[in-house]
Amino acid sequence: MRHRVAGRHLNRTSSHRLAMRRNIVSSLFEHETISTTMPKAKEVRGFAEKLITLAKKGDLASRRRAIALLNNRAIYKEENGSNVQVGTVIGKLFSEIGPRYLDRPGGYTRIIRLPKRRLGDNGQLVLLQLVGQDDKKLSNK
């Protein structure tokens, strides 16, 4: 029986789930909106919100804890046909994303269902995005 078992296995090993969670959240912080399946989005949502709460504190211990929980990968931007490093995921989290939500007590992400389904397994696709970054675009449409 499956009583009191938290989390989703997503048909992966524990190390694969951890790597997938880190990669999805890193991509979310880098691009601020990503397309994924509904179970993956629901699984990583709490992890992303926990990291944003750490970024709101902004102290050294919170930064070190966020680095331990998340891969501190570089963010690249294409300039003149070559990729140039413009920062890191943790740097963006603590300098841009954390201060953006200082007056918000929680609920930093939103899940929007997409009308199309994934080709192959017919999985429900969703947009996982940070709240506040596309509010102007949504209100204009």
Regions found by a protein language model. Give the residues of each.
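Structured, basic alpha/beta domains of bacterial-type, RNA-associated proteins
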Residues: R2-N11, A19, N23-K141
